[in-house]
């Protein structure tokens, strides 16, 4: 690595983990640039949570090596822990304590005392729009408020890398979008986010890069757009005012007609060049569609194509709720 190349937030080579005779991770390689959102997708049992536990030093890998901001997980676990924060799938909030008390407890764990602890708690309560509920028991908080408090507690120590393990599970759509904005704001401040999620739309909206984990191995990695281009099924849908125009367009372009809705589905990726060519052919033939829409494969199509197991169907159903 040259002196001008930024150090990655996470780099892993050949990570392996087994429980008895069950292989959970089978030689996983990862590199996550600092200041980005990386999303790890996979069906239940694919190894996502195991990966998070290894990278956050909660368990040891059986083989391979990994570094967090240059610190080796095996040789420098304390330095790794000082650089990271973890917000798990299940809230770590103590419902009997107030929001302020939860944050003060976390501050003491990070060796903040007195005015410094109170100042940090106040900053985070304000940042996460919890100041008005600071003195209320966390048990009285809504689901979205509890998740915000949970993340605020993770940030007490100002981590450079945050592991978010299914952070919006159980939240209503408005609370989920509020959490998305919080995550974007964190990254804008320079934090790196390692996100695992059951909601494919969440990864599509947030992640700079996505990896798909299946049966302990990374089966695909790239941006959401790159992954979608790997899957066939893109098409242009044309709708016409008259059956005669539909028939003429089908003769000119081919494709699949739907006489009932006067629609023609023409295979294609929807790129600018191909779309312009399609319209030129229609113009030359004096055929004018009433509507045109471009359809590309969704991330759930990618997921289902790449993970051929029973967990995929459950995953897709959750993504579409």
Placement of each model-derived feature along the sequence:
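ABC transporter nucleotide-binding domain
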Residues: 179-269, 293
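Conserved protein kinase catalytic domain
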Residues: 81, 125, 152, 228, ...
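A short linear hydrophobic-aromatic micro-motif
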Residues: 129-130, 256, 288-293
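C-terminal coupling/interaction segments
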Residues: 270-321
């Amino acid at each position: 690595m040259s002196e001008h190349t930024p150090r990655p937030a996470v780099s892993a080579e050949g990570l392996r983990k087994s429980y008895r005779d069950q292989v959970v991770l089978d030689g996983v390689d990862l590199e996550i640039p600092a200041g980005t959102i990386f999303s790890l997708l996979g069906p239940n049992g694919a190894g996502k949570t195991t990966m998070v536990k290894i990278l956050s030093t909660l368990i040891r890998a059986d083989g391979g090596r990994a570094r967090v901001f240059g610190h080796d997980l095996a040789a420098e676990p304390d330095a790794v822990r000082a650089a990271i924060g973890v917000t798990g799938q299940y809230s770590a909030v103590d419902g009997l304590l107030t929001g302020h008390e939860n944050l003060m407890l976390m501050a003491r764990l990070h060796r903040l005392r007195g005015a410094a602890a109170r100042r940090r708690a106040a900053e985070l309560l304000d940042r996460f729009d919890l100041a008005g509920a600071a003195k209320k028991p966390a048990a009285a908080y809504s689901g979205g408020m509890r998740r915000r408090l949970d993340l605020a507690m993770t940030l007490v120590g100002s981590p450079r890398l945050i592991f978010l393990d299914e952070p919006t599970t159980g939240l209503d759509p408005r609370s989920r979008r509020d959490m998305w904005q919080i995550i974007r704001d964190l990254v804008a401040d320079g934090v790196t986010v390692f996100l695992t999620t059951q909601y494919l739309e969440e990864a599509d909206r947030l992640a700079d890069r996505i990896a798909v984990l299946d049966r302990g191995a990374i089966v695909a990695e790239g941006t959401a757009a790159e992954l979608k281009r790997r899957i066939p099924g893109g098409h242009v849908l044309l709708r016409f005012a008259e059956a005669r125009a539909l028939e003429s367009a089908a003769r000119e372009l081919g494709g699949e007609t739907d006489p009932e809705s006067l629609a023609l589905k023409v295979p294609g990726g929807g790129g600018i060049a191909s779309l312009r060519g399609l319209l030129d052919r229609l113009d030359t033939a004096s055929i004018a569609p009433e509507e045109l829409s471009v359809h590309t494969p969704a991330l759930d199509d990618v997921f289902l194509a790449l993970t051929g197991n029973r967990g995929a169907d459950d995953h897709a159903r959750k993504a579409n709720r």
